Amino acid sequence: MDFIAVYNPAVYAKEADSEAWRQLLLYHSFKEDAEEPTPQNEKLSLIGMIQGIWQFAHNFSEPETRGSVRYVDTQLERRRVIAVEVEDGHFMAFGVEDGKRYGCEYYVRELLQSYHVFRLHCGSMSEFADRGELTDRLNEHVVGYWQALKLVPEAIYASTLASVCWHDGYKVSELELRDRAWESYIKNEILLDSESFLGLKDMCIYKLPRDGRRSAAEYGLLRSFAPEFLSLPELSNWVYHLDRLFETALSSHVLAGHVRLSIGGDEQEEEGELRHDSQPASDVGARMWRNVTMPISMTYDTMSEVGNLTGINTLMSGLNSLTSGFSSMTSRLVRRADRQNSDTASLSLHVDHGFLISPLALEALPESYRYRRFQLRFSTDEPQWYRLLFWYYKDYLCIFIFHENFDKIWDPDYLQAIDAKLYDAMLQLEGSVVTEDNKPGRFAYGVFNKTTKRIECSLPLLRFSDKRSDEKSRQPLKMVVAGIDETLQFLTAGTFATNMATSRTNDEHMGPSATNTLRMPEPTDAPSSSWTLDITKLNLFQGLNENLRLEKMADTDSGTFLDSLSSEKLLQLNVELCRLYTGIRRSEYNKAGIQEEQLLRLNNGILFYISTSPTEDVLILKNWFMDDKYTKAENKRSTSASLLHSLGGDVRRWWNARTNREQ
């Protein structure tokens, strides 16, 4: 990476030559070995060249293409520069030296997503009256976004065709369910509840499978309830971005925005860093704290069996907010709403659900641990600011979107009631999931609805940690918690490990020389799914056991035929698919209102079906060699004029089922 810049040339047109620097809102160089900072004249000269190329390119563009993303991709001296218009008059430019191995779609997607992250947190650039404040916010969010990608550039390229070329859409989960009773329960008991009706704008529920490469078709947004949620793609892609970077370490720290990636060796640990074994840096202090709290914990367990002693429970709740990592003092939330006032409530020692971000967090923590403030847009209304709370159940992540002036979220009883109701809904959801032992599919698909922006995709999710595993020379990455003083780091050390563990692909001992896998380590005193704490703590989204990862990656009895490919082969395949699809899409401007089908054969023998229309794009990859001679004969006898039907009975059955489901 060379640089990232944000500029507004319209400002320069209004100012004298001596004020030309005002058009440059942000310029960040990634060249850490540079002896001197880039001179201001050199920055302005670069922006001037980019803008000149931009005007030359787009003055001759067809009017029909104006509705799409406007960008330029050019080579300037030693570097490749991609510039995108993110707002009217505001541009973002990115310089990189990649030998043009990857299509510009990869970088256009990241530029737009970094802008969308900025807009979620700060609003539109045009809303800023103070240039200095705008630059500060760009440094915080845009530079932070790209700095993380600089440490793990594999995250840019380890993306499917769907996420790269359909960056304005959002991935939906295709989890197969027997019924939708859980949806009705959420609507009636939470959304339409008298206490929530005026304040709760929407709920978004995501399925984020934690099993190895994950089931690609099941990954994504399972349900949102508000009609015409126009910011849903930006919010969903923000969640997916955090998940791809931090993977199984998606926690309260990450969602609150207080974690940054850092390259770590065997040198002295950085300030704010926690050890990968979930132990604080001071082992003596940790043992002392355990000795102090253990008698209180045992007393609490005994008294809980007697009954619901309100005064004592209130006191112990305060102690619970200070101690973390002890199963006897955590997970104290009654799971069902009708048990809240029961004198004989059975309290579980392990609760696999709870709030990640909510006002129930420690008061000493920063505000972002109690709620996230995002600017979102619903229907045709102007964007407004909302408060977001985060809740999880196993590998489901739920986002509550509240109006900013709704003060009920500060009521602990209200939040605990929501927690109990949503837990009941998740039990209903889990009971309705259809579990079948499917054989590997002979085809993979991607469908993009241009009206709703929904993406259905079964292309394997390529994890960049797989690609890093062959690069033993790379230094391990650490996750550093920032913005929390040493006392809180100590008190919350049991909830979050900042060192990404390292492991080999065989049974050798784990150590610093092992290959990197970006995952959270498994605690030795808890089951593989128990990285959870009570809602008064800093919660960690359900983790992943390394043995499960290796087993799932080697298992080809589910998913599609592409799951058996290596990460390097998947990467090459996605780059080629992006190149082919982009070339076809660029010629759409003169084919308005026409549906076009194409069937291509790749060099590896895979058939690539592409259908483009004004409302929907459909992509299908088919392994023709997996069809037996009877299936091929059946395909030849097909009388349909559609190329899709010539791909085989399995593709036809999937397409017909999908069509019937949408009707």
UniProtKB/Swiss-Prot annotation:
Homology family: Belongs to the CCZ1 family.
Record-linked Pfam families: Intu_longin_1, Intu_longin_3
A single GO BP: protein transport
InterPro entries referenced in this protein's UniProt entry, alphabetically: Ccz1, CCZ1/INTU/HSP4_longin_1, CCZ1/INTU/HSP4_longin_3
Top-level taxon in the UniProt lineage: Eukaryota
Membrane topology: Peripheral membrane protein
Organism: Eremothecium gossypii (strain ATCC 10895 / CBS 109.51 / FGSC 9923 / NRRL Y-1056)
Keyword set, alphabetical order: Autophagy, Endosome, Membrane, Protein transport, Transport, Vacuole
Subunit structure: Forms a complex with MON1.
Keyword Transport: yes
Function (record text): In complex with MON1, is required for multiple vacuole delivery pathways including the cytoplasm to vacuole transport (Cvt), autophagy, pexophagy and endocytosis. The MON1-CCZ1 complex acts at the fusion of vesicles with the vacuole, through its regulation of the SNARE complex during the coordinated priming and docking stages of fusion, and particularly at the stage of tethering/docking.
Designated name of the protein: Vacuolar fusion protein CCZ1
